[in-house]
Amino acid sequence: MGRSSRREFLRQVGHAGLALGLGSKLGALTGCDSVNSASGRYDVIIVGGGTAGVIVAAKLLAASGGRKRILIIEAGGKTAASIGGTDLPPWLPPGAAGLALFDVPGQYSTVPFTPLGAPYQLTETPFTYQGIGLGGNSQFNGMLFQTNPPLVFNRSWPEGWGWTDMAPYFKRIRQNMPVTNTPSADGIPQNTGPADIVHPLYESMGWVETDTSRPFPEQGVFSRPYVAAEDGMRAGPVSGYFEEVDPGGVPVEGLEILEFTKADLIEFDDNGRAAAVHYTKRGALDQKLPGEPGSAKLKKDGLLVMAAGGLVTPRLLLLSGVGPKGREGEIFPGQTPVPFAIENQHVGVGLFDHVLTMVTFGYDGPVPYQAYNYADYEGNEADLQEYLATRSGPYAQYQPVSILNLRRGSDVPNVEVFVNPNGAGTPGGPFYGPDTLSAFIMLLNPKSRGLVTLDENGNVRFPSIYMPPDTPEGQEDIELMTQATFDILQLFKEDPGLGIVFGPGSQSFPDLDPDNIEDVRTYVTSPSPVDGVFYSRLTVNHWGGTARLTDGPGGVDPETLILRGTGNVAVVDASLIPTVVPAHPVGTIMAVADRAGDILAAKWD
């Protein structure tokens, strides 16, 4: 059975109360709809049905054969059509079925920071776009797959988490989730103009075109991006793991899902064991709706699994009295917090993210090229019809459309350049014409770290980790970003068809000289936005490190994944990653979650 027909079958059998077997352990389990409130006591409560949460849920269900009660508390609801998602692309014809907004690779760039995606933006992280819904950010992002370098695992992760330990899990992910650089169902690369323009420049530097989804020894490599897709549709944790335990949006026996529900507080007993999770459940996706309070209780030997992501997992722990004693004033600035009841010096500490600088170019050279606006449904009608008919064409293509990874004075990749087939700002505006493309320079191994801090409403505050000028680490990041951006500007200058439209020397920054490295430094450190365009110190949503694996004291126990200071709280998401991943991290997050499922399930053996 092909994967697309298999997805349709899952939708059908889900409503018939059946399920396929994940590893043949879930066959013939009857299902029930998502629940309106928690009842009784649970063997496992998973806070967050995102990238890691859905993988761990599927693994634990397979291990238990449906004999354990597992509850997912998720702030959003259904996403992909294969798990009952009904939020449709705005261009889908009436009566069409089998395709949700999140299934279309090209659609993802029209969701964050737009009216279309506003209901899915988590309100507790107001400075950025964190998507809510089953599958989490893996349903909202570009699913660009890269591998954490083996050297990083061997040098910076605890014993037992080296490359030989993790390589089988990367292999397993790719078995469950196809990775390709031609996501269009017809196998034809889409929106190739930017790659056709810049890849010859990369070749001139001696950099190598190769499979950038796998570890590489070269100093510089480039490719069309390798992404998670199959038959022209988004692939990921939902398609690779979760749709088998939630077919058609009907959870199999043993799984319950509290949708539109936010965890407010973890209740601990006197021994540091989580006893319950107090939550607020809304009646729909709208986060402004009032909710009903409730509590989900654990069995005496139950397990609480934190899978809400690198920002929200530490947020809930901190609000629940778990954190670094003595730093309450830093974490709750301007407030009068009570001392943390459970000591763990690594909760909320060591936050990292990648950081971006953007430059937009115009092109008038010999390579055929036209910018592509995925939100122009009227202008793209023929492409939409092609996608509906064959799952091929531009809407089967994620952004970006070109990737370059470099080692600059480093034994691991520390700079990436990716290119999108469109300009900056409003389509048709001064920086987004028919011949524009945008290059993003990203630090893959930034040195700056920070704290998760909360405002008086309990929301996560903007972290000062994006090249802060007042720290040695920030200065080191500024130096690398300056040099990397300067070098790319000089390289792109070698193609006479490329000219800067937004960036130093353009109408947006006429007083800055792109050939002067100090002016480039001014550009990469100047405040955004300018002329309505955000271009410097950009967040990337690759957070982690906020409840990291350590050999102690504090942090998470590498052997059990239990958060030290607690008796039964496990962490399985990006929070436990001990150091920045010098790659797009979704593959690493998935590999960690797959292994976490094995570690946690072993307690039932």
Segment roles from a protein language model:
Residues 85, 90-207, 368, 439-466, ...:
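Redox-cofactor-proximal catalytic regions of oxidoreductases
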Residues 139, 152-269, 274, 508-509, ...:
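Conserved redox-cofactor binding core of oxidoreductases
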Residues 159, 358-484, 536-545, 571-574, ...:
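FAD cofactor-binding and catalytic pocket of flavoenzymes
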